[in-house]
Amino acid sequence: MAHKKGQGSTQNNRDSIGRRLGVKKFGGEFVRAGNIIIRQRGTATHAGNNVGMGKDHTIFALIDGFVKFERKDKNRKKVSVYPA
């Protein structure tokens, strides 16, 4: 009778590593063109003025300036960069 015994704990203790998502540059912070402002999955925050969005929804600065988080409408946020 081939039974497997004592294998329970060897199948546990696996987890995926964190994806390092989130806000990288906060409101009022100075950024240079190309700096990443937010890494996100989907468009939790939308691109505003002077920022671009990558194919993985990463928001980055297109010009040198200061980051400003704003409301796009009642339930959507956007982030913009304004020149110094």
UniProtKB/Swiss-Prot annotation:
InterPro entries attached to this UniProt entry: Ribosomal_bL27, Ribosomal_bL27_CS
Q: What is the species listed in this Swiss-Prot or TrEMBL entry?
A: Campylobacter lari (strain RM2100 / D67 / ATCC BAA-1060)
Q: Which domain of life is it from?
A: Bacteria
GO biological process assignments: translation
Could you say which protein family the record assigns here?
Belongs to the bacterial ribosomal protein bL27 family.
What PROSITE patterns would the database entry show? RIBOSOMAL_L27 (PS00831)
Q: Which UniProt keywords apply?
A: Ribonucleoprotein, Ribosomal protein
List the protein's name.
Answer: Large ribosomal subunit protein bL27
Q: Could you tell me one molecular function GO term of this UniProt entry? A: structural constituent of ribosome
